[in-house]
Each structure stands twice: as structure tokens, then as C-alpha cells.
Amino acid sequence: MVRARVRRHLELLQRDHPSLRRHQIIESEPGRDYKWRIIVPRATFARVVAAMVAGIGYGNFKGACAASPDLDPAYNTALHDVWAVFRRLQK
């Protein structure tokens, strides 16, 4: 199962990885932590992840997200907020 808080993220995953297109995006029950899901075999998603890793070409993840026209600017703000929280843990 692949879960997301933002439906658009799963739509982009399906756009970029045709093997996921035959799997329907479903909305989970109210109150669940991740609202959106795709039920996909583990082996299929493992191939998707391997392709994603092989295709990494950016030097800065947050910067690449900020430059993407496909992502909501609020997502990039959330990435920076999470980064700031974890930065405080660094010693």
C-alpha cells in the first residue's frame, strides 16, 4: 500500500510510473492518518522506488520541489517546517 496526505502526489506517481496506473487511488475512511492510498503489490512498488532512486538528478530535494510546477507551494513550506524541526535534533 502506498499512502499519501495529498491526492496529487499519488496522481504524479501514477503519471510518472505507468505500472501504477491500473491501481485505483482510493480515499480512506474518515479520521485515518493518510487520506489517500493505492493498493499495489510490494514487488511492483519496489521497482517504482528503484526507478525513482536511479533517476535522482537533483542536489537539493527541497529546492527541486520548490522548482516543480506540479507541486503546491504549501508542500514546500511543509518540507521546510519539517526540516527545521529535525535540524534542532542535530548535535
What are these regions (language model features)?
Residues 1-91:
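Structured alpha/beta or helical-core interaction and ligand-binding surfaces enriched in interleaved
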